[in-house]
Amino acid sequence: MESIKKILDAVNNRLTGEETEITFEMNPNDVSTKKIDGLLMAGVNRISLGVQSYHDQELKALGRVHDSDSILEAKKILQDTNTTIDLMYGIEKQTLESFTSNLMRFLSSGINHLSLYQLTIEPNTIFYKKELFLPKEKDIERMEAIAKELLEQNGFQQYEVSSWSKPGYESLHNLNYWHFGDFLGVGPGSHSKISNDKKIVRYRKIKPLEGYIKNQKTTDLKTIVEDDLDLDIAMNLLRMKNGHQQRDLSIKLPKSFFEKYEKGISEGLLLKDKIGTTEKGYKFLNETIQLFF
């Protein structure tokens, strides 16, 4: 905990302002009164809890080390702490009933922010090599519809593809990402983005801790030049549910972006009065983003 305090003190002395959001990610089994008190004393003001599911069978399918009992215990400890929860859907053997139960358990917690992610199977992972019994596409779509209905009924707004909150509880770092703001990553495996009107530079630090200690130089440096900016911009800006006023963006949009954007307007996928999608465009976001290739 002392190391965390030193890092946050160094950051606070250089970069942060009065309204800085400082989020610390934890798994439920890592939560204890002592740890939370220490984090709050160090300056953390938001806890991100990786619940994923309230059902032990689904947690086991995900390879998680915590269980439903540890989630309940963590909830008690965090009851007076600004908290966000991660949940997943599309989990192996997950049913509409168990997914609905997960949402109801979340809603009963009194927490004001939810990150809701669909399980995606990436190549070269343990899940990719296994035979999985995942929910069918029609059930995935039904889960998304159930989430929209229940969350909106309970005062939550979808402000980004995977993010729901009550008004005033939106994640500030999420908003920065999807408004195309820059960010600085510090530590093993961290990502950064630095941009101007002509190019975007993205880079990642070495991930294994031992390798990072030996060599803290940047790896995976990627420069996106003017000709390729359109897609990168679209993949970020169009995730925001309510769109953007151009004057609020931290980057000047290229002429080529607007040429492609006009096509999206004509197809009923993009808005005329601001940078964002229509309901149809948001529902078919991947197809909408294809316009910017």
List the predicted regions and their residue ranges:
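C-terminal scaffold of the Radical SAM
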Residues: 1-250
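Short amphipathic alpha-helical interaction segments
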Residues: 251-266
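A short, conserved structural fragment
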Residues: 265-274
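Minor-groove-contacting beta-hairpin "wing" of winged helix-turn-helix DNA-binding domains
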Residues: 275-279
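Short, amphipathic alpha-helical interaction segments positioned at domain boundaries
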Residues: 280-293
